[in-house]
């Protein structure tokens, strides 16, 4: 093949047709020798035949196709392979669609899917309006929705959208924008490309913005006072409705009507936070909740067939959520399960070399790393990594210290692990792993000892949050600068916690559940590095510690894990919580 990005698709087709691979070769050789051929195809004066026995064969003129494309189609008919390149893919798809050669159409569609980028996604989407390639159309359209903010900045094709095409994009729940300001700014850019002919469309486009979700100051200064809005009589009732909706939201909080009102309806999240398993009510739980950051709501998606697990690790890689190691109050696990969120199926994969409870897990360059932990006898300094393609775990260099109940993350191509418990004391040390040389190095120690810690890369720093210092559960947090090799303190959380989940969603650092020194908790809060402040988020429905979190982006069925837009309910009262609070925890 001429392009590496398409090679996987073609090798798959060869495997599907193994029975005919040799037959295809034989028939093509016969064609080239003029045997078993009874017609000649003529395209723009070019004859598709051999030099043998041409005099008695019927000639067919084929209009509307170039000789080079017909040559590829004929060769595909005999060989079931076709060279697809950036230069020929569109013309080849058009020709294949004309002659209903669906194998080539699918191959070209797969190739173009791999070529989708900010600059060409709109062009490819519009191209699919004329030819039957529904999967390519869906992929291109979702690429536009998922990368809207970046696409608006990079694409010149965006400026050529019709008003209806633009309106259809910005009204979608799947539009991936963190703030509605970005949608309004996109409208201004689109109108600004041709103001005399486009400013009249502001009244059509403005209601598609979730105006009541904007910051009031931005709305008043940038939307209400903009000339395109002020000069439109049709925009005035839209502005009034938005102000009323903003007032109701601020005074009364979220209500069931918010999801039916187009001005207050949250977009669907691009990424879903999964909170998996943990320790609840004095025993491990199999509970799984997902967090919809755009609606600030949790959804219970527990699969009752799954066994309980606590003090495990969770990681997302290439379409799967992996649950690694852990403890069920009897056994310490080396087993690993993976969950496919699209099909909602669970499968066992290869086990680790060691049993690991209190394990630290992270992902780096298509490998899952599992480090330290407790095997039921000793705290571990060993580490290993998993490669999904081979379904194998491989031991890597051991850490400098034994660490259970530590936490790990990746930043700038390296693995960082911080804190933990070595069997004698809570640790303030931290290490970094360089996979290129398979080597661990100690970095500057944290300012506090932290076992049951949460560690996450956020912005340009590694954050170490909460934990247990040997005497108290901690509210404090600190950030590591890898360039300066220094730690600095950041504002404290509202609540002390250890053994909690930690992740970054929509540029906010979330801490989920945990143990506060007296009880397991369902409390959630988030930190914004831009404001250097913590904020309360909606509580989980289940009290638990020893859970693990991971973030799953770009799900095609995201609505199944997000708050339902067609049946939204407001805040869940705490007396409806399904699991009671418990002071029981597994001893460190």
Question: Where do the protein language model's features map onto the residues?
Answer:
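Eukaryotic adaptor/scaffold assembly regions
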Residues: 122, 126-131, 135-266
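Generic recognition of well-structured, leucine-rich alpha-helical segments
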Residues: 30, 76, 80, 96-102, ...
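Amphipathic alpha-helical interface elements that mediate macromolecular binding in regulatory proteins
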Residues: 67-71, 75, 87-90, 102, ...
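Kelch-like beta-propeller repeat domains
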Residues: 200-588
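Charged, flexible boundary elements
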Residues: 14-36, 252-261
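Canonical BTB/POZ domain core
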Residues: 33-120, 145, 160-196
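Cytosolic, low-complexity regulatory segments enriched in Ser/Pro/Gly with interspersed Lys/Arg
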Residues: 1-22, 574-581, 588
């Amino acid at each position: 093949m001429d392009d590496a990005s398409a090679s996987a698709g073609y090798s798959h087709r060869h495997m599907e047709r193994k029975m005919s691979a040799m037959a295809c070769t034989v028939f093509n050789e016969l064609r080239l020798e003029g045997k078993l051929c009874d017609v000649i195809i003529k395209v723009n004066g070019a004859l598709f035949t051999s030099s043998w026995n041409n005099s008695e064969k019927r000639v067919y003129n084929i209009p509307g196709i170039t000789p080079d494309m017909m040559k590829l189609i004929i060769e595909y008919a005999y060989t079931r392979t076709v060279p697809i390149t950036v230069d020929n893919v569109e013309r080849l798809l058009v020709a294949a669609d004309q002659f209903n050669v669906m194998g080539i159409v699918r191959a070209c569609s797969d190739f173009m899917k791999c070529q989708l980028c900010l600059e060409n996604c709109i062009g490819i989407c519009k191209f699919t309006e004329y030819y039957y390639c529904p999967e390519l159309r869906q992929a291109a359209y979702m690429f536009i929705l998922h990368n809207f903010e970046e696409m608006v900045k990079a694409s010149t094709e965006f400026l050529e959208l019709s008003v209806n095409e633009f309106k259809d994009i910005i009204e979608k729940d799947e539009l991936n924008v963190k703030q509605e300001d970005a949608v309004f700014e996109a409208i201004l850019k689109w109108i600004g490309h041709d103001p005399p002919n486009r400013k009249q469309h502001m009244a059509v486009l403005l209601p598609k913005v979730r105006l009541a979700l904007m910051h009031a100051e931005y709305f008043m200064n940038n939307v209400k006072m903009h000339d395109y809005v002020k000069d439109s009589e049709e925009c005035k009732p839209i502005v009034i409705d938005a102000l009323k909706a903003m007032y109701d939201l601020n005074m009364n909080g979220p209500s069931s009507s918010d999801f039916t009102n187009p001005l207050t309806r949250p977009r669907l999240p691009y990424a879903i936070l999964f909170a998996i398993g943990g320790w609840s009510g004095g025993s491990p739980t199999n509970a799984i909740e997902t967090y919809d950051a755009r609606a600030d709501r949790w959804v219970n998606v527990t699969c009752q067939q799954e066994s309980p697990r606590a003090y495990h690790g969770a990681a997302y890689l290439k379409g799967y959520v992996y649950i690694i190691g852990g403890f069920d109050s009897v056994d310490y696990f080396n087993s690993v399960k993976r969950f496919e969120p699209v099909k909602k199926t669970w499968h066992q994969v290869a086990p680790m070399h060691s049993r690991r409870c209190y394990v630290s897990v992270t992902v780096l360059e298509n490998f899952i790393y599992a480090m330290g932990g407790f095997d039921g006898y000793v705290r571990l300094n060993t580490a290993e990594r998993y490669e999904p393609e081979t379904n194998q775990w491989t031991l890597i260099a051991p850490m400098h210290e034994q660490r259970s109940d530590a936490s790990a993350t990746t930043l700038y191509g390296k693995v960082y692990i911080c804190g933990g418990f070595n069997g004698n004391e809570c640790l303030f040390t931290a290490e970094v792993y360089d996979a290129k040389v398979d080597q661990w190095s100690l970095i500057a120690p944290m300012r506090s000892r932290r076992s049951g810690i949460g560690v996450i890369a956020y912005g340009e720093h590694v954050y170490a949050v909460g934990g247990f210092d040997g005497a108290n559960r901690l509210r404090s947090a600190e950030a590591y600068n890898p360039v300066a090799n220094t730690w600095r303190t950041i504002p404290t959380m509202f609540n002390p916690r250890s053994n909690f989940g930690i992740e970054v969603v929509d540029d906010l650092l979330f801490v989920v559940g945990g143990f506060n020194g007296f009880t397991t908790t369902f409390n959630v809060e988030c930190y914004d590095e831009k404001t250097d402040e913590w904020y309360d988020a909606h509580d989980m429905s289940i009290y638990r510690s020893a859970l693990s979190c991971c973030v799953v982006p770009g799900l095609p069925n995201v609505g199944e894990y997000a708050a339902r837009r067609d049946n939204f309910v407001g805040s869940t009262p705490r007396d409806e919580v399904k699991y009671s609070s418990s002071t029981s925890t597994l001893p460190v």
